[in-house]
Amino acid sequence: MIRPYSPSDKPAVLHIWREASAIAHPFLSAALVAQAEAMIRDQFLDLAETWMIDADDMPAGFIALLGNEVGGLFVLPSHQGKGYGRALLDHALHTRVELELCVFAANHQAHGFYKAYGFQAGEERLNSFFDQPEIVMHLSR
C-alpha cells in the first residue's frame, strides 16, 4: 500500500534510509553518513513530497520528490527485489511526465535498477557533498 508520508513516519524513514544506504553506499564514510542523516531528518523531509510503501502494515520503503527530481528512493534490504521500488516510481509518474535523479556511479545495483525501469543515463558529475561521482538519469513517459 502506498500512502502519503506523515511526520510520525520520520523514525521509519530514517531506519529505512540507514539500512538501505549501508548496502548501497558502503563507500561513504561514517561521518558523511551521519551528516546526511541529520540533513534528511532536520531539513529534507520537510521540503520533499514523500510517499511510503507498506508491507504487512509496516513501512518498507519510501520515495521523496522535489518537483520532478527523485531526491531519494529507498527500500529495506529485506524487501528489495519484490517490486516496491518500481511501485513507488510508478506512483510518482502518475502525476509527472518526467523524472530526474542522481545515482552514485559506484552504486551499480541502483544504476541497473533505474536503467531497467527506463531511465536514460546523462552526464556524470561530482557530488560535492559526498565527494563522489554521480550519474544524472532522466525518464520521460
Predicted regions and their residues:
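Conserved GNAT-fold acetyl-CoA-binding loop/helix
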Residues: K10, L14-R41
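Conserved beta-hairpin
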Residues: A48-G61
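A short, internal acetyl-CoA/4′-phosphopantetheine-binding micro-motif in the GNAT/acyltransferase core
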Residues: V70-Q80, V103-F104
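Conserved acetyl-CoA pyrophosphate-binding loop and the N-cap/start of the following alpha-helix
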Residues: H79, G83-H91
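Conserved active-site alpha-helix within GNAT-family acetyltransferase domains
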Residues: R86-A87, N107-E123, N127-Q132
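Conserved GNAT acetyl-CoA-binding A-motif
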Residues: H94-A106
